[in-house]
């Protein structure tokens, strides 16, 4: 739930109750670029792209390392392909411009892949090939 400056406690409680009623678990965050989850997730994925670009490891090994070492159900590069590399680039650009912080600079490889039309699963090619 995104809680604005003028969101009353009553409104917040009603939204939380509705989420619970429809079987969801709500978290509350203030209104900020990327909110809570994407603010953590997207820079992690971007860093995996930097690691791939720098030749630290293959896409397969980076993903396997995060699955095994961090107990993630999917690796960051496979997840980027699922999200869409164009979407990932857009999010990172919003962060970079919104926070004016170099830690949010999109990886050059991400920009190159988007420019080449390699957007992930939706185009059949991203960090992995999907046979479309």
Language-model regions, residue ranges each:
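NAD(P)-dependent Rossmann-like dehydrogenase/reductase catalytic/cofactor-binding core
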Residues: 3-31, 35, 49-54, 58-132
